[in-house]
Structures are given as structure tokens and as C-alpha cells.
From Swiss-Prot:
It is found in: Membrane. It comes from Xenopus laevis. Keywords: Glycoprotein, Membrane, Signal, Transmembrane, Transmembrane helix. The chain crosses the membrane at residues 129-149, 167-187. This is TM2 domain-containing protein 2.
Length: 198
């Protein structure tokens, strides 16, 4: 009795599945460790002369230091724990939803201070602004929403093209997007927050 021979297409599909599985397994085993600069954040340097005119660099006022933007770990909690600062996620609608972190700061050139010139400071919110204004997007959605201009503005290009080709879903998609925008369900695609107008 002979075994039935499966069709060639099934054999090729099974071979591709095995190849994909082995390549995914091998890529997981070939990760390289991430190296971060060694920064001593726990111990403050001892001042050389406590009666001298120099203050610790970490005590300088805001106008004499420049600080980096919060580090984006893109959801990697391990990297955040190793570095001991940075943001796992950006943005949020309410204050409780927004993470806070310390940022790396440096004393400006020409400022004399005691101790390390690079230090961690502050409790900065993990928020980024990329030029999206709520009122502008709301006006786009109200007047030009049937052409998908609001979705193009927010960076949702795929759905914007669909909205454009269907004329806003014959008005239904236009109305739904207007409600989503007002209730906070439609945000910029890069997870940034709305810019505030002062």
C-alpha cells in the first residue's frame, strides 16, 4: 500500500511555514544587548569648597541649564528600568494617564559650577507636540470632512483616502468622525497631544 502524495502547493506552503518559524526563532536568539551611558544618578558629588562661591550644577536655576526631551523607550519597560529614566509611552487625555520622568540636563557653556555638568532633573510629563491643533482639525472636519482632509491632517492617510473616495461615506463617515473628534476618540496618528493656543 502506498502513502498518498500531497499536492506540490501544500508541500511548498508547509516549507515556507517552517522557514518562517525557524527564521523568527533565530531572530529572537540573536538580540544584542543595548548599552547605555554610565551615569551616576544616585550619588551627588562632594563640593570641593563648601564656603566657595560655586554651587552644585544640579542646583542651578532653569535659565542656566539645557535639558533634553524625555527619552522614548517605545513601550520597553526593561530599558526604562535599566536607564532609570525615560518614557514607556507618550500622551494621554487626563493628568493621571500621563507618565512623568526625569530628563538629562547639562549646565550651559560659560557657567561655572561644582560637580558633574550632566545630571538628571525634574519630573517632566511624557508629552510631545507635533503641530496638531484641535480647533484647526475640528474646522477641517466640519467643512472638508467629506473629502477626508481631517484624517489627512492627523496622519491617518489610509482611512483618509477611503473617506475621500466614498465622499465621507456618503455623509455617515463624516458625521462619525466629527463626533469622534469632539469626544477625543480621534487623535493624531503619532500619539502626540494637541498643541495648546495661548
Amino acid at each position: 500500500m502506498r502513502w498518498p502524495v500531497p499536492p506540490l502547493g501544500y508541500l511548498l506552503l508547509g516549507g515556507q511555514g517552517l522557514l518562517l518559524t525557524f527564521s523568527l526563532i533565530s531572530s529572537q536568539n540573536n538580540t544584542s544587548p543595548v548599552t547605555y551611558p554610565d551615569i551616576n544618578v544616585s550619588a551627588a558629588p562632594e563640593p570641593r569648597d563648601p564656603l566657595g562661591p560655586l554651587v552644585l550644577c544640579s542646583y542651578l536655576p532653569e535659565e542656566f541649564v539645557e535639558c533634553d526631551d524625555p527619552v522614548d523607550h517605545m513601550g520597553n519597560g526593561t530599558a526604562q528600568q535599566e536607564l532609570r529614566y525615560g518614557c514607556k509611552k507618550f500622551g494621554g487625555q487626563a493628568y493621571g494617564d500621563v507618565e512623568h520622568t526625569q530628563v538629562m540636563c547639562r549646565a550651559l557653556d560659560g557657567i561655572e559650577c561644582d560637580g558633574s555638568r550632566s545630571f538628571l532633573r525634574g519630573n517632566r510629563p511624557c508629552i510631545k507636540y507635533t503641530g496638531h491643533y484641535f480647533i484647526t482639525t475640528l474646522l477641517y472636519s466640519f467643512f472638508l470632512g467629506c473629502f477626508g482632509v481631517d484624517r489627512f491632517c492627523l496622519g491617518h492617510t489610509g482611512t483618509a483616502v477611503g473617506k475621500l473616495l466614498t465622499w465621507g461615506g456618503l455623509g455617515i463617515w463624516w458625521f462619525v468622525d466629527l463626533i469622534l473628534l469632539i469626544t477625543g476618540g480621534l487623535m493624531p496618528s503619532d500619539n502626540s497631544n494637541w498643541c495648546t493656543i495661548y
